[in-house]
Amino acid sequence: MTIKVHHLRPAPGAKTTKTRVGRGEGSKGKTAGRGTKGSKARKNISAAFEGGQMPIHMRLPKMKGFKNKFKVTFQVVNLERLAELFPNGGQVGPAELVDAGAVRKGQPVKVLGTGDLGGVTLQVSAHAFSASAKEKITAAGGSITEL
């Protein structure tokens, strides 16, 4: 027999009816499971109240400082990666790096000086360069352009 949606039933005991409290003298009537007297028996008590214990929101440290909304985060590319991606040399800019899969588009690019160019001559244009990257590119006979 195939199972059909209209044959499905919840497991026995899976669905229980909600207990209505404070309705008559039976179970959960009168005091509705709150005991007698005291602040917890009366109107409302804060969800953050932990019975006099120092609450978690006061035990945790305050977050210090602020987030600078003008901060520029660069995508970094090292010289060794440039030498891998462009072994024949030539023009290298953000568009070429996006096409090569080295960076994502829409964010500024910074070239860092880790690794060696291995004699590859590159004309690199990027938004920022480290000092060591500038030295190594120009020493290999290439040129740099800051965008």
UniProtKB/Swiss-Prot annotation:
Region ranges (Disordered): 1-42
Swiss-Prot/TrEMBL keywords: Ribonucleoprotein, Ribosomal protein, RNA-binding, rRNA-binding
Cystine pairs: none
GO MF annotations, alphabetized: rRNA binding; structural constituent of ribosome
InterPro entries assigned to the protein according to its UniProt record, in alphabetical order: Ribosomal_uL15, Ribosomal_uL15/eL18, Ribosomal_uL15/eL18_sf, Ribosomal_uL15_bac-type, Ribosomal_uL15_CS
GO biological process: translation
GO cellular component terms, semicolon-separated: cytosolic large ribosomal subunit
SUPFAM superfamilies named among the record's database cross-references: Ribosomal proteins L15p and L18e
RNA-binding as UniProt keyword: yes
Annotated family: Belongs to the universal ribosomal protein uL15 family.
UniProt-listed NCBIfam families: rplO_bact
Function in brief: Binds to the 23S rRNA.
HAMAP family the record matches: Ribosomal_uL15
Quaternary structure note: Part of the 50S ribosomal subunit.
Protein name: Large ribosomal subunit protein uL15
Organism of origin: Salinispora tropica (strain ATCC BAA-916 / DSM 44818 / JCM 13857 / NBRC 105044 / CNB-440)
